[in-house]
Amino acid sequence: MIELTVAQIAEIVGGAVADISPQDAAHRRVTGTVEFDSRAIGPGGLFLALPGARADGHDHAASAVAAGAAVVLAARPVGVPAIVVPPVAAPNVLAGVLEHDNDGSGAAVLAALAKLATAVAAQLVAGGLTIIGITGSSGKTSTKDLMAAVLAPLGEVVAPPGSFNNELGHPWTVLRATRRTDYLILEMAARHHGNIAALAEIAPPSIGVVLNVGTAHLGEFGSREVIAQTKAELPQAVPHSGAVVLNADDPAVAAMAKLTAARVVRVSRDNTGDVWAGPVSLDELARPRFTLHAHDAQAEVRLGVCGDHQVTNALCAAAVALECGASVEQVAAALTAAPPVSRHRMQVTTRGDGVTVIDDAYNANPDSMRAGLQALAWIAHQPEATRRSWAVLGEMAELGEDAIAEHDRIGRLAVRLDVSRLVVVGTGRSISAMHHGAVLEGAWGSGEATADHGADRTAVNVADGDAALALLRAELRPGDVVLVKASNAAGLGAVADALVADDTCGSVRP
């Protein structure tokens, strides 16, 4: 964050200083980072007093200041230097922090944080900062990681860790930028119409990227049409002097070209795009290979990330880098060198015993679940050797009235892709639908051996991650391939971590 005095921050957010004199507030400076975890605070930092599931940040204000925080942003006096903003009604937002906001204190601090980030972003843009916004139903984090890699040779990049993409993570990421930052990459998530427009007001992007319109959070939106309207808030927010990168292979995204005043850059897997990929092939770990075409030039790309769906993500990252002045050759080299970054997102690890773990446990929706299963099937069914495959799948959250049908489709898809073992983790109607869909599609749920399917080719439903892990530990064989995927709330990341940690021979991450 740029250096500001306590008094300056108070003026920006409309707060009053407490437990610090006006004279001291005019001289005390915030020189460190903004944090909402008191354990992460450092010298000169700004601590956000937010309510949580187990504790209220207001109760940890003193420890944050003792750890070096210059001041606390709070909704009430906390006995140490603070900027106090009055409680407000919680807006319709994503941030889980407001789930435990019983008195409006969390909403107040969050609103003040947005004001501070807005002011800082405006100063940095005036100094030459380029802000890039990314949205889409899936692929935002993977694209963000690739984009950070291709922009790094051009200047200093700030991007969110993991999926910090809501009303808390978005301004928090903005405030990581300094006067040395050249490129600020921001993910923009939504669960309601207007969410992306609100995020874009905090840090107006000069480049916007729309990846896809799928069915993630369908239960919250109500229809795919509303999802498309919400994603379109990003290209509508980009000014005429900016650029909007659209995935032309998704009709709902391609239609957004009519909704923006900015210049449109289309990416595609064929030559109809301004930036496009030549014939795509996959290696033995489902890592894409293709020729990148743009600006009458071309270069070979060998991605280090897993899954055919990563091609579109890479093309969007490439289009942004090209807009920022990189050459096609520079972009191809950076994409090829980019490793997987964010945890639990298509991380492929091969253990010393030959078991390959595909950890995509951070999140799941129907589109990303299909992509994960297709990658699993590709890795398991190589011409040189067919390997036994496991799909360990949990619930896809927030699908509303389509939840039963979508889970049923995923169970059936596992059978059609010839997955050897489907382990459905959890309880409830959606989980049952996934299991029953697999059984009905292939009649392989009983575990009975037939001429075509051995006794190990079954679909099973287990209660939780511990039960899934026990089953895997008992039955995995050297050379098996395991996909672990679910919405984050299912907690299957711990299963993937344990499978990798079980390796006693030394694992390899490609």
From Swiss-Prot:
* Gene3D superfamilies for the chain: Mur ligase, C-terminal domain, Mur-like, catalytic domain, MurE/MurF, N-terminal domain
Q: Which domain of life is it from?
A: Bacteria
The compartments listed are: Cytoplasm
Which Enzyme Commission numbers does its entry carry?
6.3.2.10
What keywords appear on the UniProt entry? ATP-binding, Cell cycle, Cell division, Cell shape, Cell wall biogenesis/degradation, Cytoplasm, Ligase, Nucleotide-binding, Peptidoglycan synthesis
Q: What is its main location?
A: cytoplasm
Is Cell division included in the keywords of this UniProt record? yes
- Give a Pfam family name: Mur_ligase_C
The protein's annotated pathway: Cell wall biogenesis; peptidoglycan biosynthesis
Question: For this chain's UniProt record, which GO biological process terms are given?
Answer: cell division; cell wall organization; peptidoglycan biosynthetic process; regulation of cell shape
Q: Which GO terms describe its cellular component?
A: cytoplasm
Q: What does this protein do?
A: Involved in cell wall formation. Catalyzes the final step in the synthesis of UDP-N-acetylmuramoyl-pentapeptide, the precursor of murein.
Query: Which family is it part of?
Result: Belongs to the MurCDEF family. MurF subfamily.
Q: What HAMAP family has UniProt attached to this entry?
A: MurF
> Further remark, if any?
Was identified as a high-confidence drug target.
Q: What is this protein called?
A: UDP-N-acetylmuramoyl-tripeptide--D-alanyl-D-alanine ligase
The gene from which this protein is expressed is murF
